[in-house]
Structures are given as C-alpha cells and as structure tokens.
Amino acid sequence: MEYDIAIIGGGPAGYTAAERASENGLKTILFEKNAIGGVCLNEGCIPTKTLLYSAKILDSIKSASKYGIVAMKDPSFDLAKIIDRKNKTVRKLTLGVKARLTGNGVTIVEGEARITGEEFGNIRIHCDGKEYLVKNVLVCTGSETGIPPIKGLSEVKYWTSREALDLNDLPKSLAIIGGGVIGMEFASFFNSMGVKVKVIEMLPEILGNMDKETSAMLRSEYKKKGVEFFLNTKV
C-alpha cells in the first residue's frame, strides 16, 4: 500500500496535519499507538475539565444555602459514575476526531509504527505485521511525562496525571509535587472530593506563568478550602 504522506502520532498536531494533507489531495495515512487525540483529549485537558465540572457541581450543592436554596448539608457522590462520565466524554470526542479524519479520506492505523528503510525512493513503514510505502513522513509523536529525579521515588507507588485520572478509590491524603496548572487542577478536584491535599512547589508562588496577584488570590481561596501549600520547597 502506497501513500503520499504518513503521519506518526495522532495528537492535535498529527490529526490536524493529516486532515489538511488529505484536504489538499494527498493520499494520507495516520499511525497512532495509543488513542487518537493525544494527551489533551485522552489524558489532559478534556478529562480533567470533565472531572472538575463534577467537583464544581458538588461544591455548588454544598454552598447552596448561601443563595437561599435548601440542599443536603453533606451531599454524597459516586466516584465510579464520575469516572465513567469522564470516560464517555473522552470516548465521544475521540470518535468524533476519527470520524472527521476518515470522512476526509485519511487512513487510520492503530499500532506502533516503525520506519524500517527505503524502497525505490519510498520510505518503508511497518505496523502490526503490515508494510506501508510512503513518499513523505511527518513525525508528531509528542512527549512523555517527565519524572523528576527524587531520591526514593522509584521505591514507592506514585501517580502521574495518567493514574490520577483513572481511580477506583480516593486516597485519604495526597501530596502534589508541582503547583502549575495541572497540579492545581488536581488539587482542586481532590480537595472537593474530600481528600486532604498538600501542594509542594519549588517556586515562590503557584502558577508561576500567571500574574502574581492572580496566583496569590487563587492560593488564598484554595487555603480557605483546606489545601496546604509548601512554597520555595524542593523534594
């Protein structure tokens, strides 16, 4: 099977490039070893915002009396249903991206692609036992989660954002190393779910890329909710 262009990696860069290439008349094939949509859709922006919306509803019920609404003082929640809703949301959007790609004539291959050589001026790619010949290759493989070199970390069971998104049970307490956007999103969610949260940040303030006044205001609001902060702290 021959193609004008192969794109390795089905994240935002990869699937957008595949769509544009196909729209411009190129016979296009897209390889993805995990899930179409990349980190943002499957393990980042979308799932975290879905979880945070559930947390927002829970917080709203808890504070309903402020607005003259009589509600349960201690509303409960079903973690399994919260996670299931998150998974369904991600699945729906992933299927939407796939449908858009196939509708534009892009061939999608789910598996790990390997460039194995050249043949008559074409590049040879193997994936799941099949061979593909392409004229051009665009690599959009993204990145992996960076694990800091913390002494003893490899000896304990730690989470990255990936594990934190697929839970069966909530921990009683949680230390979050890093007070950036991702860290604070998880701090907000777990705090709303009743988990005792501590945020450890090596910089003088959380959300270091934001305006200092905004970061300080957000930290103050989180502290009111019970989140503990350790700034200027290295682990």
Question: Model-found features: residue ranges?
Answer:
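Glycine-rich flavin
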Residues: M1-Y3, E19-L26, F31-L170, L203-L207, ...
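N-terminal Rossmann-like FAD-binding beta1-loop-alpha1 element of flavoenzymes
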Residues: D4-L30, G183-N191
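Residue-level marker of alpha-helix boundaries and capping positions
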Residues: I8, N87-K88, I177, N209
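Conserved N-terminal Rossmann-fold NAD(P)-binding element of oxidoreductases
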Residues: I8-G9, F31, V139, I177-G178
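Short beta-strands and strand-loop turn motifs
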Residues: A80, V199-L203, F230-N232
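Conserved acidic residues
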Residues: E112-R114, G180, T233-K234
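Rossmann-like NAD(P)H-binding beta-loop-alpha module
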Residues: K157, N168-E205, N209-M210
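Conserved acetyl-CoA-binding loop of GNAT-fold acetyltransferases
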Residues: V195, K223, V227-E228
